[in-house]
Amino acid sequence: MADLAKIVEDLSALTVLEAAELSKLLEEKWGVSASAAVAVAAAPAAGGAAAEEKTEFDVILTGDGGKKINVIKEIRAITGLGLTDAKALVEGAPKPVKEGVAKDEAEKLKKQLEAAGATVELK
């Protein structure tokens, strides 16, 4: 067991470049590929994640719908941005207005922006 503890300590002291080199050397020595093992291990996790319901959303402004002034006013009210920043956000669409918000809040923000004339999508 002392030998294993020493190996763990030695591996923990490696830099990222040294660890990558070690990985390549082990692949050559054992005749395996680390990337294949990672792909196989990640596949079941990806399937499980797709089944889960998304809980955080990004509110993305995709356009001003020809009502730029109303949309800028609404962006300022929602985000607290100054006039210049809000105008830049609207003119630079598609841009995120808020990121990582709950589903209810995202839906509420989408309705507010659409009422002002904006086109919005949730991601």
UniProtKB/Swiss-Prot annotation:
It comes from the Bacteria. One of its GO terms (molecular function) is mRNA binding. Coiled coil: none annotated. Signal peptide: none annotated. GO terms for cellular component: cytosolic large ribosomal subunit. The keyword Ribosomal protein applies. The keyword Nucleotidyltransferase does not apply. InterPro entries: Ribosomal_bL12, Ribosomal_bL12_C, Ribosomal_bL12_C/ClpS-like, Ribosomal_bL12_oligo, Ribosomal_bL12_oligo_N_sf. GO terms for biological process: translation. CDD domains: Ribosomal_L7_L12. Keywords: Ribonucleoprotein, Ribosomal protein. Homodimer. Part of the ribosomal stalk of the 50S ribosomal subunit. Forms a multimeric L10(L12)X complex, where L10 forms an elongated spine to which 2 to 4 L12 dimers bind in a sequential fashion. Binds GTP-bound translation factors. Forms part of the ribosomal stalk which helps the ribosome interact with GTP-bound translation factors. Is thus essential for accurate translation. Belongs to the bacterial ribosomal protein bL12 family. This is Large ribosomal subunit protein bL12. The gene is rplL.
